[in-house]
Curated annotation (Swiss-Prot):
<keyword id="KW-0862">Zinc</keyword>
<comment type="pathway">
    <text>Protein modification; protein ubiquitination.</text>
</comment>
<feature type="region of interest" description="Disordered">
    <location>
        <begin position="233"/>
        <end position="324"/>
    </location>
</feature>
<feature type="compositionally biased region" description="Low complexity">
    <location>
        <begin position="275"/>
        <end position="290"/>
    </location>
</feature>
<feature type="modified residue" description="N-acetylserine">
    <location>
        <position position="2"/>
    </location>
</feature>
<keyword id="KW-0863">Zinc-finger</keyword>
<feature type="zinc finger region" description="RING-type; atypical">
    <location>
        <begin position="190"/>
        <end position="231"/>
    </location>
</feature>
<dbReference type="GO" id="GO:0006511">
    <property type="term" value="P:ubiquitin-dependent protein catabolic process"/>
</dbReference>
<dbReference type="GO" id="GO:0005634">
    <property type="term" value="C:nucleus"/>
</dbReference>
<dbReference type="InterPro" id="IPR039525">
    <property type="entry name" value="RNF126-like_zinc-ribbon"/>
</dbReference>
<dbReference type="GO" id="GO:0009651">
    <property type="term" value="P:response to salt stress"/>
</dbReference>
<feature type="compositionally biased region" description="Low complexity">
    <location>
        <begin position="251"/>
        <end position="266"/>
    </location>
</feature>
<keyword id="KW-0007">Acetylation</keyword>
<feature type="compositionally biased region" description="Polar residues">
    <location>
        <begin position="291"/>
        <end position="300"/>
    </location>
</feature>
<keyword id="KW-0833">Ubl conjugation pathway</keyword>
<keyword id="KW-0808">Transferase</keyword>
<protein>
    <recommendedName>
        <fullName>Probable E3 ubiquitin-protein ligase RHC1A</fullName>
        <ecNumber>2.3.2.27</ecNumber>
    </recommendedName>
</protein>
Length: 328
């Protein structure tokens, strides 16, 4: 009953084997705990088999045979429950009928499948013939929905969360001096930069009684109308002047911030703005205005753009924040 094809499964060797002579004995271990395989379908790797002796036979084929038989049985069981979708290739002498599933290693299939090539393809959907399933198009995200997603992601002007704090609300924040009671409480550190307050130094106090360094809380309030700790919003300013003040900041904040930053440099205790990495791009107002200018004059000189860029960088240097796009 010897054959070049593995006809039984040895439970001791845990692989597909051939019988040793006429007895139901494993060819490799000599054990009798073998089970006949369903050979209704040919092994997909018969085309790669060597006609040389058993000693020279590559054991990779044994693993591939066992895997092929296992998956073929699993697919046969599933076919009773539901219809397996896949491309059906007509059976013929040249199509190797019933070759499923098929395991293909990276690169061209050599005479002996050796090396560390990774698995490239697996299964052909249980359909007769050699083939590889295409991916289900329903599993991919494309079409109008994808375009809408890109539009939402590219909408840099879309805001999330509280709006920016009004200028009047930022101006109305009281400035306090750090006393011993502050250092003995949980307010001894600035929640933004985590630096400890110095006795007698100044700090800004929010309506929720949380205190911050002035150069730590002002950049936050320019973007968010709330406390970074408890999220309590600042009172909104009444009147149309608040929105105008937000879009056209005065030079008082720039001069005061510039002086405070220069003093901190002289003392050698300059604090790095923790929010500078959040705004690596230009402000929405400047980007929208530059977009309109480019739309009106597409062929303008690059020197004008460079001049505007350097002017903007000069304005940002008032606060000493790298990447900070506002005039505060």
């Amino acid at each position: 009953m010897s054959s070049s094809r593995n006809t039984h499964w040895c439970h001791r060797c845990q692989r597909a084997v051939r019988l040793h002579g006429q007895e139901p004995v494993c060819f490799y271990c000599g054990g009798g705990f073998v089970e006949e395989l369903d050979m209704a379908q040919a092994s997909p790797f018969d085309m790669f088999r060597s006609h040389r002796g058993v000693v020279e036979r590559d054991q990779t084929f044994d693993l591939m045979d066992a895997f092929s038989v296992f998956m073929r049985n699993r697919l046969a069981e599933r076919s009773h429950d539901r219809e397996i979708r896949g491309r059906t290739i007509s059976s013929g002498p040249e199509n190797f009928p019933g070759l499923a599933p098929l395991l293909i290693f990276g690169g061209q299939v050599p005479y002996r499948l050796t090396g560390d090539n990774a698995v490239e393809a697996l299964f052909n959907g249980g359909s007769p013939g050699i083939g590889i399933t295409r991916g289900n198009t329903g599993d991919y995200f494309f079409g109008p929905g994808l375009e809408e997603l890109f539009e939402q992601l590219s909408a840099g002007t879309t805001r999330r969360g509280p709006p920016p704090a009004p200028r009047s609300a930022i101006d109305a924040l009281p400035t306090i001096k750090i006393a011993q009671r502050h250092l003995r409480s949980s307010d001894s550190n600035c929640p933004v930069c985590k630096d400890e307050f110095e006795l007698g130094s100044e700090a800004k106090q929010m309506p929720c009684n949380h205190i911050y360094h002035s150069d730590c809380i002002v950049p936050w309030l320019v973007q968010h109308n709330s406390c970074p700790v408890c999220r309590q919003e600042l009172p909104s300013a009444s009147g149309p002047s608040s929105s105008q003040n937000r879009t056209t900041p005065t030079r008082n904040y720039r001069s005061s911030s510039s002086s405070s930053s220069s003093n901190s440099r002289e003392n050698g205790n300059e604090r790095r703005n923790p929010f500078s990495s959040f705004w690596p791009f230009r402000s929405s107002g400047s980007s929208s205005s530059s977009t309109q200018n480019r739309g009106g004059t597409r062929n303008s000189d690059t020197s004008d753009e460079n001049h505007n860029y350097h002017q903007q960088q000069h304005q940002q240097s008032y606060m000493g924040y790298s990447g900070w796009p506002f005039d505060y």
